[in-house]
């Protein structure tokens, strides 16, 4: 009789210990597959043409990067979503940033000029100025040339 009670107690303890508790259940239950994909960050800016890079940063090719403006208010909601997101292109900078627009590297807190993010603008030589270059591209080329000149000395 005591052996039967001991066996039932062990089985009961085993059943309780393998339960899925509220605080550690994956979405869809114990047998759900883990989420492997990282979603794209929320859209922001005028006519939703940008992506959130942080709670106060919105960047897009057509608009550049907006920081702390009313257009970035929507990005604050990104902190309340449970799934992680990733905005931008390739990794850049020393603080875990990603290329936001041509020549700019942004993380969740700030943006900085980065020559790794120049993309197609980098392939143009400084003497090859064409008539269809936008003012932004010209400014980025000048910034790149000035930072390159400072690092050589």
Curated annotation (Swiss-Prot):
Entry PTM: Seven disulfide bonds are present in neurophysin.
Key words of the record: Amidation, Cleavage on pair of basic residues, Disulfide bond, Hormone, Secreted, Signal
Subcellular location(s) per record: Secreted
Pfam families attached to this UniProt entry: Hormone_4 (PF00220), Hormone_5 (PF00184)
Keyword Lyase attributed: no
Function: Vasotocin is probably an antidiuretic hormone.
Protein name as catalogued: Vasotocin-neurophysin VT 1
